[in-house]
Amino acid sequence: MKLIISNSTNKNKRLKAVFIDGNKKITRHFGFKGGSTYIDHKDKEKRKNYRKRHEATEKKFYTDPTRPSTLSRFILWGNETNLRDAIKSYKNKFNLS
């Protein structure tokens, strides 16, 4: 499956992910437009708090790369400090191109 990340066309969201698998196309918008994430502030304590807060309800979905919560968790709040590396890491984690 191929993944393309770009700026969101949704006024309230930060990024858009388009998953292409043959003729099937899935579009997901994710990340709050005005929000600050680990990619922005690089604050490990805030990242830890975000993960703890969201994993209680979202962890069961983290195996589905097309879910907005998974995209946010591993791209905006992952281990990388810049967007390009975060996307590359995400693609590797979920075997996407």
Predicted regions and their residues:
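Arg/Lys-rich, low-complexity, intrinsically disordered basic segments
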Residues: 1-97
